[in-house]
């Protein structure tokens, strides 16, 4: 994420103490260094409420991932219930796609299944009714 110039924040309703215990007794056994981004506490769920992931009745937050552009606009979000983890590779792919679109000022867009280095589309009247000439459904799937 750092190589892409992306700031990652982890936010949960857990206290800083719980975050430390999780880092020291769980995460430290999975990676050989400290977590590479801040873990912030949202006790009371104010931030989670703003993003629609806080359950006030249970006092918990559903796992959510939000891609926010440099202008503060949410470009993508994914909300998953606890039994299913999110895909880091997919998050990176989406960030690269949004960065490409931003860098080209929308002159290029990424089709379904796009991967870095693969063909992009140029939106416009000429593409209408002709996407099939530029892109195939099989490109939406991993090899």
Question: Model segments located where?
Answer:
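Chalcogenol-based redox active-site neighborhoods
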Residues: 1-143
């Amino acid at each position: 994420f750092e190589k892409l110039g992306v700031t990652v924040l982890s936010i949960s309703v857990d206290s800083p103490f719980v975050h430390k215990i999780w880092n020291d007794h769980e995460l430290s056994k999975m990676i050989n260094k400290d977590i590479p981004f801040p873990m912030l506490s949202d006790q009371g769920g104010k931030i989670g409420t703003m993003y629609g992931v806080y359950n006030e009745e249970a006092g918990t937050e559903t796992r959510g991932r939000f891609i926010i552009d440099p202008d503060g606009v949410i470009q993508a979000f994914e909300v998953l219930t606890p039994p299913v983890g999110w895909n880091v590779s997919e998050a990176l792919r989406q960030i690269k796609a949004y960065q490409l679109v931003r860098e080209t000022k929308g002159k290029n867009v990424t089709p379904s299944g796009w991967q870095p280095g693969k063909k992009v589309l140029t939106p416009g009247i000429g593409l209408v009714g002709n996407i099939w000439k530029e892109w195939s459904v099989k490109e939406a799937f991993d090899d």
